């Protein structure tokens, strides 16, 4: 689907979540009622109202798109699109792939450019198999750096304060991703 020059299918998942949240706000209302479990006793549930305009896409300070693999090579990553997310999480046609296979495939799909001091290689110039081979040859230390890219990438986030009615203890609760807001 293309809308005014924007390919919706290629947008990062966090942009899609933000758009979905705002479309929902315009159609159903600006406030969302959620039930939060109090962190102090992990059992008391408290209803909370959140206003959509308070929910933001948050980017971690530790987040980097450029991952230094060694002194001579840097890997630039791109965010997973909605299509990539769906293919890697809901592909019912390929049940033979393990979680590890799907993780490696997602990482390979999110490669953008590989840089050395002399050259740069655009990942689109290489087949999916070649990109996968590149990812598979990373050391565990290098792969952990790539994992940080995904762990720290932007996401919908909102912190709320709740008071447990039983213990009167105040706690902060962080809600992240659509599941926390609509789950």
What does each model-found stretch correspond to?
Residues 1-183:
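Long C-terminal interaction/binding lobes of large macromolecular proteins
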């Amino acid at each position: 689907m293309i809308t005014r020059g924007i390919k919706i299918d290629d947008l990062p998942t966090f942009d899609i979540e933000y758009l979905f949240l705002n479309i929902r706000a315009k159609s159903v209302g600006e406030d969302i009622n959620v039930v939060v479990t109090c962190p102090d006793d992990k059992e008391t549930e408290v209803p909370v109202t959140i206003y959509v305009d308070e929910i933001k896409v948050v980017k971690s300070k530790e987040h980097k798109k450029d991952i230094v693999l060694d002194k001579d090579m840097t890997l630039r990553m791109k965010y997973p699109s909605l299509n990539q997310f769906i293919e890697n999480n809901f592909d019912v046609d390929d049940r033979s792939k393990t979680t590890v296979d799907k993780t490696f495939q997602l990482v390979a799909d999110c490669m953008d450019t590989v840089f050395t001091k002399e050259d740069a290689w655009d990942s689109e110039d290489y087949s999916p198999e070649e990109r996968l081979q590149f990812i598979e040859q990373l050391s565990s230390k290098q792969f952990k750096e790539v994992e940080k890219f995904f762990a720290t990438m932007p996401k919908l986030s909102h912190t709320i304060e709740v008071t447990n009615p039983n213990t009167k203890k105040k706690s902060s609760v962080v809600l992240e991703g659509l599941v926390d807001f609509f789950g």
